[in-house]
Curated annotation (Swiss-Prot):
Pfam families: Bac_DNA_binding. SUPFAM superfamilies: IHF-like DNA-binding proteins. One of its GO terms (biological process) is regulation of DNA-templated transcription. Heterodimer of an alpha and a beta chain. The keyword Ligase does not apply. PANTHER family: DNA-BINDING PROTEIN HU, INTEGRATION HOST FACTOR SUBUNIT ALPHA. SMART domains: BHL. GO terms for molecular function: DNA binding; structural constituent of chromatin. It comes from Nitrosococcus oceani (strain ATCC 19707 / BCRC 17464 / JCM 30415 / NCIMB 11848 / C-107). This is Integration host factor subunit alpha. Transmembrane segments: none annotated. This protein is one of the two subunits of integration host factor, a specific DNA-binding protein that functions in genetic recombination as well as in transcriptional and translational control.
């Protein structure tokens, strides 16, 4: 199961007493702010959660799996996420209890 924006909206609706339209707008604005910051080349740092950063990947050789032909994979910019220590600790504690 995955957490969705609809789930987040529902949680804001139930826990904070916002109406569904307001809750949906807050969730959408949150993600739009993250998108805008990343589009402008800024890192996004969410204390206690983690960091979203941009990383430039250089061109590298690739291979067509069907033909075996070498094909260059073009340079590109990707978004990476690095979890913070608090998030890591909570995930590890939860995962440790499930084993």
């Amino acid at each position: 199961m995955a957490l969705t924006k609809a789930d987040m909206t529902e949680t804001l609706y139930q826990e904070l007493g916002l109406n569904k339209r307001e809750a949906k707008e807050i969730v959408e604005m949150f993600f739009e702010d993250i998108r805008c910051a990343l589009e402008q080349g800024e890192a996004v740092k969410l204390s206690g959660f983690g960091n979203f950063e941009l990383r430039d990947k250089g061109e590298r050789p690739g291979r067509n799996p069907k033909t075996g032909e070498e094909i260059p994979i073009t340079a590109r910019r990707v978004v990476t996420f690095r979890p913070g220590q608090k998030l890591k600790a909570r995930v590890e504690a939860y995962a440790g209890g499930k084993q």
